[in-house]
Amino acid sequence: VYVDRGVKIGNGVKIENHATVYAGVQIEDKAFVGPHVTFTNDLHPRSFSTDWKIVETLVKEGASIGAGSVVMCGVTVGEYAMVGAGSIVTKDVPPRALVYGNPARVRGFVCKCGRKLKKEKENQKFVLMACLHCSEKYPISKESYTKYRKSKGEQ
């Protein structure tokens, strides 16, 4: 594991073997960083550049980042979100979103226990999602849910 100077790591965080966490990354409490995960910190990397700036990245509480993923600088991975193995994260990940792929896209939503959520009902602002495993329920913003449906080709 390589953790650069200035990285902020919360309580109960698990960072697996061969992860690389560069300056500018903040990982909040109870997050998980899988093996071979890499965080970047420079939008315009050049070996000869003298004016580069660290671009901050935030991994929120309870989020999980799967093995071999790359998290580009400047993004926020939301609370209890889950990034699938081998993903390339180029944009913010909403809270409780399940994302994977290259680039990573929202493919669903997950419970705090890690299982996929099912849509229960919706109103103008939120979609209520429920976990069939532990019976927890979560309001997901209509904006996040709409992006998910569009990524599936739905209207």
Question: Which role does the model predict for each range below?
Answer:
Residues 114-116, 137:
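Cys/His-rich metal-chelating microdomains
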Residues 119-120, 139-143:
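Short, non-ligating residues that shape and space the ligands of small metal-coordination modules
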Residues 130-131, 138-140:
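Alpha-helical "lid/cap" subdomains adjacent to substrate-binding clefts that gate access
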Residues 106-109, 129:
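Cys/His-enriched microdomains
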Residues 120-128:
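Short linker/helix segments within small regulatory modules
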Residues 111, 131-134:
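Short cysteine-rich clusters marking metal-coordination/redox-active sites
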Residues 145-155:
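Short, intrinsically disordered terminal segments enriched in charged and Pro/Gly residues
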Residues 1-100, 104-106:
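Structural signal for interior beta-strand "rungs" in well-ordered beta-sheet cores
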